[in-house]
A protein has these predicted regions:
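Hydrophobic core of transmembrane alpha-helices in multi-pass small-molecule transporters
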Residues: 14, 95-112, 299-312
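Symmetry-related core transmembrane helices of the 12-TM Major Facilitator Superfamily/SLC fold
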Residues: 161-180, 362-380
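C-terminal ends and interior cores of transmembrane alpha-helices
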Residues: 77-92, 283-295
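Intracellular juxtamembrane helix-capping segments at the cytosolic ends
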Residues: 110-125, 312-326
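Extracytoplasmic gate region of multi-pass secondary transporters
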Residues: 23-24, 206-251, 255-259
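Helix-to-loop junctions at the C-terminal end of transmembrane segments
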Residues: 55-68, 154, 260-272, 355-356
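Juxtamembrane intracellular "pre-TM" segments in multi-pass secondary transporters
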Residues: 1-3, 185-213
Length: 390
């Protein structure tokens, strides 16, 4: 039972990655279809950001009342509906319809993120093995598959409409099939068993280590989200490459993300979280700095990979650190997750408004500043001395 459950969640993580990178790979063409400038695209992306935050909040309601399985089914329908609306809106060159589609897709994606991570923690508890890093790597692999499909579809001249509709159908059917292997009421049962002595939301927010972890997650999730949203357009506008080439370069960022998540497990066990996080931050900062300098396209491509490699560990490491003490893990992980997702979703649209004034490459200096801020708090990911014996 656990093996089928595990495989089903891997597929759901992968499909989530495919869906989001499909949208990112077609953003330059959607922008052209809408005849929108960078500032307008930033506002359009707010639809995705707001929808995702709404989905994150609503997921708690659905999971507590109906369980993770029902939440995943609802999220799959919302993502299908959102992608369909997005495809139609792009074809009609309607900014309003595209924004509405992104809102629906974002709501489904946010809800799915919470539910599938919950299922992952339940599988870990059931089989007594750590599998969440593999699940997150599956998401990254999905983003690479989606980007690769985007390159192929653009090369073949397949329209945005057909591409998005095909992915919408594949996403909905695959997740629907996978839910057959997910137990009923996972999150519902877990919520009902939570002790009354868990840390309150107010107390959790006052914990210095939790605040530091939230700051790291906020900064580095913003770094990752900015790359996802703006690398294709930055390559087209800043380096004057074709739409298909911009997607190839974006795929290099995804390769960096995947590599970081696949190889980090053993390195973290050997050298510790703090050292690995500092190395990751240096990698992201160096990569982004070289991209901004605009030395050459070859240097840019190598730097994009370094950016992805460095950005891969921020979110997973802070969530892992927030869960060190099982007595307070629920609230602390929730705070770190919410901080990260909020920055990842709301930061890039704001960056777009700034880029409309100074250009995307210059706007990336703000992202570089966020990386530096994260570096200040790296000690927070170390396991507390009181727990190191356990």
């Amino acid at each position: 039972m656990e093996l089928k459950w595990y495989k089903a969640i891997i597929v759901i993580f992968t499909m989530s990655g495919i869906s989001i990178s499909t949208w990112f790979s077609r953003t330059p063409e959607v922008r052209d279809l809408l005849q929108a400038n960078t500032g307008t695209m930033g506002l359009i992306l707010l639809g995705l950001s707001v929808g995702s935050i709404v989905g994150l909040v609503l997921s708690n309601v659905f999971v507590r009342k109906k369980g993770g399985r029902v939440a995943i089914v609802i999220s799959a329908f919302l993502m299908f509906l959102g992608f369909t609306t997005l495809a139609i809106g792009s074809t009609l060159s309607s900014i309003f319809v595209v924004t509405a589609g992104l809102f629906l897709f974002g709501a489904g994606s946010g809800m799915c993120n919470v539910a599938m991570n919950l299922e992952g923690t339940e599988i870990e508890y059931s089989i007594k093995k750590t599998i969440l890093p593999i699940l997150h790597a599956s998401f990254s692999i999905g983003t690479l598959i989606g980007a690769g499909a985007g390159i192929l579809f653009i090369h073949l001249g397949i329209s945005v409409l057909i591409h998005l509709l095909a992915i919408a159908l594949l996403l909905f059917l695959s997740i629907l099939i996978c839910t057959r292997f997910i137990p009923h009421g996972t999150g519902k049962d877990q919520h009902e068993k939570l002790p009354d002595t868990v840390e309150s939301s107010q107390t959790a927010w006052l914990n210095k280590r939790t605040i530091s972890l939230a700051m790291i997650a906020l900064c580095l999730a913003f770094v990752e989200g900015s790359a996802n949203d703006w690398i294709p357009l930055a390559m087209v506008d800043g380096y004057q490459v074709s739409h298909s080439m911009s997607t190839v370069i974006y795929a290099l960022f995804l390769c960096g993300m995947i590599s970081g998540r696949l190889i980090s497990g053993r390195l973290i066990d050997r050298f510790g979280r703090v050292l690995l996080l500092r190395v990751a931050i240096l990698s992201a900062a160096a990569g982004l700095f070289l991209v901004i300098l605009k030395i050459s396209l070859v240097v840019c491509m190598i730097s994009i990979f370094l950016w992805g490699l460095g950005a891969s560990l921020g979110f997973p490491l802070t969530i892992s650190a927030a869960g060190d003490d099982s007595r307070y893990a629920v609230k602390r992980v929730s705070i770190v997750t919410l901080s990260g997702y909020t920055a990842s979703l709301s930061g890039p649209p704001i960056l777009g408004l700034l880029a409309n004034q100074v250009g995307l490459l210059h706007a990336f200096i703000f992202v570089l500043f966020a990386i530096c801020i994260a570096g200040i708090f790296t000690k927070a990911v170390a396991k507390p001395h009181s727990l190191q014996a356990h």
